[in-house]
Amino acid sequence: MSEIKDIVVQGLWKNNSALVQLLGLCPLLAVTSTATNALGLGLATTLVLTLTNLTVSALRRWTPAEIRIPIYVMIIASVVSAVQMLINAYAFGLYQSLGIFIPLIVTNCIVVGRAEAFAAKKGPWLSALDGFSIGMGATGAMFVLGSLREILGNGTLFDGADSLLGSWAKVLRVEIFHTDSPFLLAMLPPGAFIGLGLMLAVKYLIDEKMKKRRAETAPSAVPAGETGKV
């Protein structure tokens, strides 16, 4: 149970692929102009990570070490192609919005890295959990960044949610404030870099505060031989 908890905590927070490892920055910065796009690409990446880790782990005993990386890439490409066709079939609006960034998941360092570092050494179910946790950690970072950029840039949240969830999701759109001239800095790549930098700073402050709190609540160690001395 402790191993499962550690995998989840590492993926979601301590070893977050976007906020700690800083992997997959190209789609993170390019696609997160809206919360819907960020959530769509994040969930697609999570599905690819989970299925890839599961497959790599299941085949690890029959994968020659000398050619393991090309095999991993073939597995990842196959999974990404399947996910791309699913999005094209059931969320065509999102498919058009994400464009080239769906097939580019194949080259994402997160996917290859987890296959090599974890799935090739652990069992299928732990590997699938690792992929899911890492993917949800990345999805959370994308969603927060996309939400901030959409709110600051257009004054809305979940604009275009129907392209991801269907026509019923039009009711999710929220207009936080009305603007006739969008704040372009938030919508362009420089705004994405600034937003990511602020998120990194906030995570660092939270980690430092938690570390300080643990140090204050930890029982002080008594040196050997000091007990009973006046």
UniProtKB/Swiss-Prot annotation:
Alphabetized, the UniProt keywords read: Cell inner membrane, Cell membrane, Electron transport, Membrane, Translocase, Transmembrane, Transmembrane helix, Transport
Record carries keyword Membrane: yes
Q: What subcellular compartments does it reside in?
A: Cell inner membrane
What's its top-level EC category?
A: translocase
Q: Which GO terms describe its cellular component?
A: plasma membrane
Major subcellular location class: membrane
Q: Which top-level group of life is the source organism from? A: Bacteria
Gene Ontology BP annotations: electron transport chain
E.C. number(s) listed in UniProt: 7.-.-.-
For membrane topology, the record states: Multi-pass membrane protein
Transmembrane region(s): 18-38, 39-59, 63-83, 86-106, 125-145, 182-202
Q: Which family does it belong to?
A: Belongs to the NqrDE/RnfAE family.
Self-association state and partner proteins as the record states: The complex is composed of six subunits: RsxA, RsxB, RsxC, RsxD, RsxE and RsxG.
What is the annotated role of this protein in its UniProt record?
A: Part of a membrane-bound complex that couples electron transfer with translocation of ions across the membrane. Required to maintain the reduced state of SoxR.
**Could you tell me which NCBIfam families the record lists for this protein?**
PRK12405.1, rnfE
> In its UniProt entry, what is this protein called?
Ion-translocating oxidoreductase complex subunit E
Q: Which organism is it from?
A: Salmonella newport (strain SL254)
This protein's encoding gene = rsxE
